[in-house]
A protein has these predicted regions:
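N-terminal amphipathic/basic leader segments beginning at the initiator methionine
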Residues: 1-50, 207-210
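Gly-rich Lys/Arg/Thr-decorated short loops/hinges at beta-loop-alpha junctions or inter-strand turns
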Residues: 44-53, 62-75, 139-142, 212-229
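Short glycine-rich or small-residue beta-strand-to-loop segments that form or flank ligand, phosphate
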Residues: 48-55, 71-74, 100-109, 116-119, ...
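Glycine-rich oxoanion-binding loops at beta->alpha junctions
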Residues: 58, 67-98, 231
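Short glycine/serine/threonine-rich phosphate/pyrophosphate-binding segments
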Residues: 59-61, 85-89, 110-116, 140-142
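A glycine- and small-aliphatic-rich helix-loop capping segment at beta-alpha/alpha-beta transitions
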Residues: 65-73, 118-128, 149
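Short, acidic/small-residue loops that bind anionic groups at enzyme active sites
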Residues: 74-79, 123-145
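Internal, active-site/partner-interface "lid" segment
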Residues: 140-150, 159-222
């Protein structure tokens, strides 16, 4: 697969720079950190902002959902790697003058570990930040073990619904409950028809035959239900 890349070690920063320039009417970099994208029109300080930290490589998730009625900020990590707890905490601190902050966390081990670390750092500074763990992928855990499911494309419903409501409501607990309701009523199932290619190494993320599809694969190539032949 052909890709237009300048230097591999700058790929994420170049991508973000291009995105911000292309959508400068809606988003901008945080003043001192080019891995934090924020909306141009700031939310009223009486309202609760929504923040997410996630690895790059899933675009337009989540940077494409930063804007009015959506997410207030996205802390971006390397490809398929969550930003560190310190980096996410840096994003949280941008909103410490608000009555509360919701940190959206997609249910993947690195995202959860680093997100919870950021919440702990916020607690130490008496910043009212609360996590909302998001999951929807039915291939990763059975009914009755929903909290073990991975986050997938269904998380975008939370971005939009909670983002719109957060422009109206000021109570963080009510917003958390709404986010949980959206999450608990969302299910997704992915189908992979070909492998992604690492822009760094040029290697395939997984192998799949031309006459196969993979049902239930995770967003990083994690295993799902299995392969199935197609005509």
């Amino acid at each position: 697969m052909k890709k237009i890349i300048d230097q591999n070690n700058n790929i994420v920063d170049d991508m973000l720079s291009g995105y911000v320039k292309a959508h400068s009417d809606r988003v901008q970099f945080e003043t001192t950190n080019k891995r934090i994208i924020v909306r141009n029109v700031k939310k009223n300080k009486s309202k609760v902002p929504l923040l997410i930290g996630n690895g790059s490589g899933h675009e337009p998730i989540a940077v494409g959902w930063v804007g009015e009625g959506l997410l207030d900020a996205n802390v971006v990590g390397d490809i398929f790697a969550a930003p560190s707890g310190d980096q996410i905490f840096e994003g949280i601190k941008l909103f410490q003058s608000h009555p509360g902050i919701i940190l959206l966390i997609s249910n993947h081990s690195g995202d959860v570990m680093n997100g919870e670390m950021a919440i702990d750092l916020a607690d130490d500074e008496n910043i009212n930040a609360k996590p909302l763990i998001m999951y929807d992928d039915i291939a990763s855990a059975p009914k009755g073990k929903e909290s073990e499911r991975r986050g997938g494309a269904g998380t975008t419903f939370i971005y939009k619904i909670l983002g719109a409501q957060s422009e109206k409501w000021e109570d963080i607990n009510s917003l958390i409950k709404m986010g949980e309701k959206v999450r608990d009523n969302t299910r997704t199932l992915s189908v992979a028809i070909s492998s992604g290619i690492s822009p760094i190494s040029g290697d395939k993320i997984f192998e799949i035959a031309d006459d196969e599809i993979f049902i239930g694969m995770g967003v990083h190539g994690e295993s799902g239900y299995g392969r199935q032949k197609i005509d």
